[in-house]
Amino acid sequence: MLSFQDRLSRRSFLQVGTCGLSSLGLSQLMAASGENDPWRLFSGKTVIFLFQHGGPSQFETFDPKMSAPGSIRSMTGATSTNVPGTEFGGTMNQLAKHADKFTIVRSYQTGSSAHKIQPIVSPDSFGANIGSYLSRIIGTNNPGNGMPLNVAAFPNAVVEDEPGPFNTFGRFADAGPFSKGFEPFVPGTGGNFQEDLKLHIDRLRLDDRKTLLQSLDKIKRQVDADGSLEGLDKFQSQAFDVVMGGVSDAFDLSQENQKTIEGYDTGHLTRFDEWKDKNNKNHYKANSNSLGKLMLLARRLAERGCGFITITTSFVWDMHADQNNLGMVRGMDYVGSPFDHAVAAFIEDVEARGLQNDILLVATGEMGRTPNINARAGRDHWGGLTPLLLYGTGIPRGHIIGQSAKDGGTPATTPIRTPNLIATCLDTLLDIPQLRLRVDVPSEALKVITGAEPIAGLG
């Protein structure tokens, strides 16, 4: 007898199952094939987009400008990296040890000083999460195991009682011009998430998986014949694909080696009383408690075939030094340190597992910070320059791309803009030359995917 635990009934399972098989196809669950199968356009690689919401400072991260006047240069000083002649902000001590493994772009600008959520969702993507383009072209799930191809993870995906999406300035899980079925899969929004994904089935029938799939295929053919699939939505389909693929363990960090979890964990780096005077104190807590584990989750999902993963903790990089936000020095201690630790742990783990040619990590925010330090020892909004870190597949190791002006406020070389970054992500995921030959690609998707060149100097 097939049944879901808790909220899903047997009828719900059958609805999910039949819709899932209709949209994905049982043959695709076994193996994608056929010359026209869009799955052939997928590189099999993963883009992990770590969004630094609030707007990180270029000075205190990767462009400290220590020869500039005191009103401009990094307030946290600088730290030497293992790349001769390259310095990072003083809080980036762990990443400084790995600077020979990634690229820093010092000429990237979003062009906006507003709290939106570009570049992950922006006018340049027609208001869609970048990963929704992968889903629209390839499909929503990996046909081999049911893993969602586009996932957006927030603190509540890894730490109970921490918040979910912070959508005040835009929806991270927006599909823009595409239907809601192409929105990112968001773990942690439905309560007992791990249990919700487990299909409870007696051992005898579980062992007879082939018979089970044959039965579901029969159901699929029946509903195709009478049209009863009408009215069932894509979310049910996606849920079915997840449980049938057995991918719930990928979202369960308790399955991970305890030493690995401890290596990623950022919860011990800060204390609540250090920011309790700020209105954004709960955001700081969520960031500290979850960032490392979110990066571990991203690695687990990448290993299991997820194509695009959005990671963001909360609104923590807006370091104005006011009633709501920390200033630059305290902010980099309590926000920059977890970032430094989590990204360095991720790089070490990926390198140890030999995954560096399979994963692209992008870390940036919606804007940078002003060259001049304000009267409260913070920095304000600035769209002229934004820090950008790139690591992994297709990325030169130990490189700096572009240069900033003397005051660190604008590019001194050709600007890298959001369409170039989007193109870099999608070029990593898709076979663009083959995609151009297809006649079934929506015009909106083609405009975004082919509308700009990837970042110059990569590859």
Language-model-detected regions and their locations in the chain:
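Ligand-binding pockets and gating/stacking loops
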Residues: 1-459
